[in-house]
Amino acid sequence: MILFFEYAIASGFEDEGILEEGKMMFNTLLNQFLEIDNVTSLIHKDFADDYKDFENLKIVEIEDDKDIEIKLNDILKNEKIDYALTIAPEDENILYNLTKIIEKYPVKNLGCSSNAIKVAGDKYLTYLTIKDYVKTPKTFKPKKYVIKKIDGCGGKFNLFDENFLIQEFVEGESLSVSLIVGKKIYPLSLNRQYIDERGFVGGEVNIKHRLKDEIFNEAIKAVKCIDGLNGYVGVDVIVNDEIYIIEINPRITTTIYGLKTEPSLAELLIKNANNEELTFKVEGKEFTINK
């Protein structure tokens, strides 16, 4: 039995853009997991009807997002779960806390460890951890900053608190690397990211690039800096004449919507959890997100 859920769908998240990305990731992996085994999933009552006709899927309905941790504990305590995977944001330690719950039980976590999430989920800790090993934009310690125009007048300024950090802007191509991390690190694909004023709005998966091997190598070097990364990991990079590591995402990313592997990504995650050698073929496609 596989326990698999996505936080936006489980919590009834109201932001349509976030929910759209959540559904893209959840539906992609859910269908793959169902080809392997029975699946139990936490799904908010507003979305449960969308999945009621799925065979071999047990739905645990959520009334309120405060119930998620309680229901997660109940399932792991009372059902025979072999593997568990949650897709959730790092914000407010959501992914960290859910992973800590999974780690209390004798199941195989298909995702990253809570210790790795603690580091990779914090942009400044990530910077401190990788800056001596890979090129990354100069980043200043989070504290209160005032930002104002050089020639401004009238006392106008913006004040940012300790929840923000200031980072050097690097011009270049916005790319990402999808990897599976275990006893070995397997690059799956190099991807182009579509980013505008709305944020991440899509991409092109498994692209060709003259620096592909070098980008893979830099991503692997960065991943090796953080203990406990496991399963699917996404690394954001900026490429110009050099390769800059921007962020390490210790979780499933929306890029998997455009990623097709043989065997499936779900099967690769399970093989990885069992310390098996991975061999695979990769195809990719372009996708967009409605925001």
Curated annotation (Swiss-Prot):
Q: Does the keyword Transport apply?
A: no
Q: What is this protein called?
A: Tyramine--L-glutamate ligase
Q: Check the record and name the Pfam families matching this protein.
A: ATP-grasp_3 (PF02655), preATP-grasp_3 (PF18301)
Q: Which residues bind Mn(2+) 1?
A: 236, 247
UniProt cofactor(s):
Mg(2+); Mn(2+)
Q: Per its UniProt record, what InterPro entries does this chain match? A: ATP-grasp, ATP-grasp_PylC-type, CbamoylP_synth_lsu-like_ATP-bd, MfnD, MfnD_preATP-grasp, Tyramine-Glutamate_Synthase
Membrane-crossing ranges are none
In the UniProt record, the gene name given for this protein reads mfnD
Q: What is its EC number?
A: 6.3.4.24
Give the function comment from the record. Catalyzes the formation of an amide bond between tyramine and the gamma carboxy group of L-glutamate. The enzyme also accepts phenylethylamine in vitro.
Pathway given in the UniProt record:
Cofactor biosynthesis; methanofuran biosynthesis
- Residues noted as binding ATP in the record, renumbered to the chain: 131-176
Which reactions does this protein catalyse? tyramine + L-glutamate + ATP = gamma-L-glutamyltyramine + ADP + phosphate + H(+)
Q: What is the lineage of its organism?
A: Archaea, Methanobacteriati, Methanobacteriota, Methanomada group, Methanococci
pH dependence per the UniProt record: Optimum pH is 6.7.
Top EC class of this enzyme: ligase
Q: Which residues bind Mg(2+) 1?
A: 236, 247
Domain ATP-grasp per the UniProt entry, residue ranges:
104-274
SUPFAM superfamilies listed in its UniProt record? Glutathione synthetase ATP-binding domain-like
Q: Which UniProt keywords apply?
A: ATP-binding, Ligase, Magnesium, Manganese, Metal-binding, Nucleotide-binding
Signal peptide start-end: none
Picking any one GO molecular function of the record gives: ligase activity
Query: Record-annotated residues binding Mn(2+) 2?
Result: 247, 249
